[in-house]
Design a protein with these regions (language model features):
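A short beta-loop-alpha structural element at the N-terminal edge
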Residues: 6-21, 32
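Conserved acetyl-CoA-binding loop-helix of GNAT-fold acetyltransferases
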Residues: 90, 96-109, 136
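Conserved acyl-donor/pantetheine-binding loop and adjacent beta-alpha core of acyl/acetyltransferases
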Residues: 68-82
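Terminal substrate-recognition subdomain of acyl/acetyltransferases
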Residues: 2-3, 135-191
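Conserved beta-strand in the GNAT
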Residues: 56, 62-71, 89
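Active-site rim helix/loop that mediates acceptor-substrate recognition in acyltransferases
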Residues: 32-54
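Conserved GNAT acetyl-CoA-binding A-motif
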Residues: 111-123
Length: 191
């Protein structure tokens, strides 16, 4: 079985609509115009920086997939250099045609150009095919990234911790100051 040749290149402004469609499930929620503006900004910023790149894979001149690459560190606490390959996505009609491999090859090439020995990526936990693909490429699980809204986390925290918010602490400090003033004036302190 021969594969259709896959070419990779840096994304440009002409790719914004295709990238928005490809990454629609991971972009912030909003209208089409907002998402297009977000992707346009990402592509523009990456094009102007040496440590970032949006790579597009094409099959027969049509965008088949893309990945965002950024040279940085493993984590803010682990300063080992690493390239983060964010959201390597392939359109469903181009899967199993070498597009994903071409994107990850571009990530390795980007890492080598920056003298970086490690590439890291993430796949959605429920995406069995993506996780198997990454495992075949020798990516080992490192962490489980979780996300929640601030309000939902706060609702699940113990109420005793919530009482220590800055507003409550400020009220407690004011009560102490007023009590100290009463003591100095010789007034009786309630309680």
């Amino acid at each position: 079985m021969s594969r259709t040749p896959v070419t990779v290149r840096a994304a440009g402004a002409c790719d914004v609509a295709s990238l928005r469609e490809l990454w629609s499930d991971i972009l912030r929620r909003g209208g089409l115009d907002e998402q297009l503006a977000d992707v346009g900004r990402i592509v523009t910023i990456a094009a102007g920086r040496d440590d970032q790149c949006v790579v597009v894979a094409e099959v027969d001149g049509e965008v088949a997939g893309a990945v965002y690459l950024e040279a940085g560190t493993f984590t803010p606490l682990n300063l080992e250099p690493a390239v983060l390959a964010v959201s390597p996505h392939v359109f469903p009609r181009f899967r199993r045609k070498g597009v994903g491999s071409a994107l990850m090859e571009a990530a390795c090439r980007f890492a080598e150009q920056h003298g970086i020995a490690h590439v890291q990526t993430a796949a959605a936990a429920e995406s069995r095919d993506a996780n198997r693909f990454m495992a075949r490429l020798s990516f080992a699980p490192q962490a489980m990234l979780r996300a929640a809204t601030t309000s939902s986390v706060r609702a699940r925290l113990p109420k005793t911790r919530q009482a220590a918010t800055p507003a409550a602490s400020s009220k407690q400090r004011i009560d102490r100051v007023l009590a100290a003033r009463r003591v100095r004036r010789g007034e009786r302190v309630p309680g």
